[in-house]
A protein has these predicted regions:
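Sec-dependent N-terminal signal peptides
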Residues: 4-13
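A structural "domain/chain start" motif
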Residues: 18-81
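Secretory-pathway glycoprotein ectodomains that are cysteine- and/or Ser/Thr/Pro-rich
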Residues: 24, 117-122, 131-358
Length: 358
């Protein structure tokens, strides 16, 4: 079963996790984290405007339910200090849409920070975490946009502190499953296979921007996902999900929408206003996948490359699927054959992590 499936109705996902009963500030690990970060802020008279970025697992791009919890809890805890004004993910997205800065890249931990002045935000809090089953160690950093510096911090929580705060109904084993990404070993192997096999080695004649419509990279079962892209060239696009199980799923174009053209210098969502008639919903199996957009200025050339995939679609399973090796052959054939460069190609990809409800 494909991980990403289209449905006709909009699904409104429930709250990600059950809120625990009120605890004291001393017992709240996220309040401790907030206080530790605030203590490292430079001297200031007005509240510092901080966005809260992504928190990934270890030295991987993968995320888990805890990734979402950390961000949401920090967005609540930081303003309580009266020293921080949190810039929400939607506001960061709006600043990026207006061309202020590349928020999609800066929310990722470890991304180099170039000096940039943005009126709406001064820094981004982001980080990585690891767990040994009894503790969770979080390595955070505040990336300062105007100066280009990074302020680092480290906190260690007891697993039972985290469990009592956000998953009081879970056993220790269940809590550990919520801390680590789904199918982490297989997913990471799949991600490495995609990059090492050079599936993404499409000729880049121009740069395109790609992000999820809501700026997230981790999604719960039943939630909808949409991809937003922008190109400096009018071009035709295909959206492909390279799954950890070795299959590659063509999400777009599909039986509900076949118009692949996106205009020059305009953000377009797939699915969205211009590309409507279908939705993409998160379903099992869960893990972390590479979602890739392939762009081409020649529709016939693009469609030729995905024609074989499209023939695999059925009424019950409308998204065509191909094995990894066949996709490698197609991508390499497309770039090798078009040596004239009269047809322009490009690609962009992101990692999306998913997990089940509960």
């Amino acid at each position: 079963m494909n991980r990403i499936i289209a449905y006709a109705l909009v699904f409104s996902s429930p709250c990600l996790y059950a809120q625990a009963e009120a605890t004291t500030q001393k017992e709240d690990p996220f309040q401790k984290l907030s206080e530790s970060l605030v203590a490292k802020l430079p001297e200031h008279q007005k509240p510092i405007k901080l966005g809260v970025g992504n928190f990934v697992y270890g030295d991987t791009p993968m995320m888990s339910p805890l990734s979402v919890v950390i961000r949401e809890e920090l967005e609540i805890a930081l303003p309580k200090s009266n020293q921080v004004k949190v810039i929400t993910r939607s506001n960061l997205d709006q600043l990026e849409m207006e061309g202020e800065f590349q928020a999609t890249e800066l929310v990722e931990p470890g991304t180099a920070v170039e000096k940039v002045t943005v009126e709406g935000v001064e820094g981004i809090v982001r980080g990585r975490f690891v767990s040994d089953g009894t503790t969770v160690t979080l390595y955070t950093e505040i990336a300062w946009l105007q100066g280009g510096e990074v302020t680092k911090d480290k906190v260690t929580w007891k697993m039972n502190e985290v469990t009592a705060r956000v998953w009081p109904e879970k056993s220790a084993e269940q809590a550990q499953e919520a801390v680590t990404p789904q199918n982490a070993e297989q997913s990471m192997a799949g991600i490495e296979e995609v990059t090492n096999a050079k599936l993404l080695n499409v000729r880049k004649d121009f740069d395109i921007q790609l992000k999820t419509a809501d700026g997230e990279r981790v999604y719960e079962e039943g939630s909808n996902i949409s991809f937003k892209m922008k190109s400096p060239e009018a071009c035709h696009v295909a959206v492909i999900c390279h799954q950890s199980d070795g299959n590659s799923v063509v999400l777009f174009p599909n039986k509900w929408h076949k118009d692949t053209l996106i205009p020059k210098d305009h953000w377009v969502s797939i699915p969205g206003t211009l590309k409507s008639g279908f939705e993409i919903e998160i379903a099992e199996p869960f893990g972390s996948d590479v979602v890739q957009v392939i762009a081409c200025t020649d529709q016939n050339a693009l469609m030729k490359e995905i024609k074989g995939m499209a023939s695999a679609a059925t009424e019950d399973d409308p998204y065509p699927v191909m094995t990894r090796g066949m996709v490698v052959k197609k991508v390499k054939a497309a770039t090798a054959a078009d040596v004239s460069k009269q047809t322009l190609w490009s690609e962009k990809h992101i990692i999306v992590s998913t997990f089940p409800k509960g």
